[in-house]
Amino acid sequence: DGQIPIQLKLGAARVYDDVRMAAKTGCDSIYIDGMEGGTAAGPHIATEETGVPGIAAIRQARNAIDDVGMTGRISLVYAGGIRNGGDVAKAVALGADAVAIGHSSLMALNCNKDIPEADYPAEMGVEAGECYHCHTGRCPVGVATQDPELRKRLDPDEAAERVYNFLHTLTIEAQLFARACGKTNIHSLEPEDLAALTMEASAMAGVPLAGTNHTVGVEDYHHL
């Protein structure tokens, strides 16, 4: 009935084919999770050795949406490794309509922070900054837990202010990135505003190597 937006979330794997199929379902947006995404509940082999990098996933997803004629009708949301405004701006330039943020917001909440109330070695068997035990429900800073005593370690008002400051700063950084590219709106960013520093990045993102007009994998190569 058009009252509730429907979003499909996909892990970045066979991105182009998956997004093409998803786009035909009539959903409102497609959420792509790149391999850079952080989670404390997944095994190391899954979080570090599987998935498709964001710069490749975004371009493939955008091409898929465009190719099925759903441009402007289905929004592309990207998540995975968004840590600062530069990450946001680059994702938008590559074709994302929006980004989603998870792990970095947890950091702003106090995740993994060495606070006086938390004894990481005694409580978790690890040092502060190396916790990653969200799934156990024993979060020493009170973020990922339902334990009443542990929850007291998190001040909701202070935590909300930290998250606000993080998101506000991230927004300002993204705007500065757009201005540096001569754009008045971050959504005006496009691939031509980017340059790749490695051959791999050029091939995956479909943008020229810095200082050249050459995009790896594209035959028409012209020297500046």
Describe each PLM feature range:
Residues 147-224:
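C-terminal extensions of enzymes
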Residues 1-151:
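Glycine-rich phosphate/ribose-binding loops and adjacent secondary-structure elements
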